[in-house]
């Protein structure tokens, strides 16, 4: 199929309204296979306005007939139409276009081009920026890199030798036959062979058998993730699965115990058993205790996101109405529960010296939310720029979060939600809360989090394409597209992404989850409705102050790194 077949009208005269306190742009509007472009006239600024069509979440079109638009160019003020584009990055754009027929044709073209489902026809497969080479920055291989890090840490560990060399890198999933959503290599107990892994995979939903997510060197404990066991109504058991979790405790240290953090409610887990799922039986997994910490996912979380954006987009509501709607959408409640569950897992490892297994049902959503946040709390390396990028690769991209499904639509789509859910956005919001409470402990700033949000929904890079590593291999994403990290790590981008106040903090950071401690992330949810200039000026001032301090040889210190009551 040629893109030209979907373009009914290629260009028209138009005016673009972008938001408050932003001047309108007037010129020639052009539709291409992947972009919407507005080329200003010769008397205007030479800047070219560009919108990736994949960024369009919903489109509303109105034929105006003889409507007198609020335009200063007479060529558009008569027979005209209006297109309102609501974008996945939460922008709302209005295009006033000359000619009703041209308006409707352009709207239909945008609808068709923005909803193409084929991965290999998406823009990342055509994007060839200057200064970047294909294959560059696709060198992140978290299982291999992380295994080497564990080896270094265990060799220097004061724990007994037999208990610290207890993990191995398994390539049993080399052809993705064990688990299509896992990477080719995973870290598992050395005492468990690949045959046992295969049997355990058949006992777990989607083949997601327990694998190591994080090794906490100071206490010699581990964080694992998996999917639910397929016990079913008959309460089935799997000797290999039991052996795997028994080996985890045996190889941690003598007398070690474990906690299974189930991100479903006890009632939901019980209902799952009726459809073939279930939980680990106490008798079958001695030494492991199950804790239920329900986290919303799927449609309830998507509806919460939609309600929040509806409230943020209403400029005429009263203070009481705003506070009521903010409370009613329950978004900050989801943030609180996610951080609380991550703190529970981190406390179990740090304070109790316990091993932690996290799973829900599929193990690809709230499970990854908890394991990644727990690592940020405990691991200083995850709070560096490079470490955070590796965390995203390890715990989200290669761990099988289905970005293509979850980020198919944002908050404005008119279609009934199917697989969409802002799980990754919830993670980014939680990280923003950590950065706000510990302003010196993260090497990356809000700009990095905003960039990750934008690129997860629509990007010229291939990093967030597809739903699993298997799909990315089939589509040759790593050889035919550019990595997002290659773009973000360019020197000219780093000033916008880094935290100028960062000071390495070797301690765990324990966030407060009290209601008064959590804030609405205005930099994301209100960034297109509030003028950006004040925050941009403040950011540049912070950079200037931090640079002056470093020049004078003084550095700030972060005093908020101890657990809060």
Regions of interest found by a model, annotated:
Residues 377-383:
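Post-Walker A helix-loop "phosphate-sensing" segment adjacent to the P-loop in P-loop NTPases
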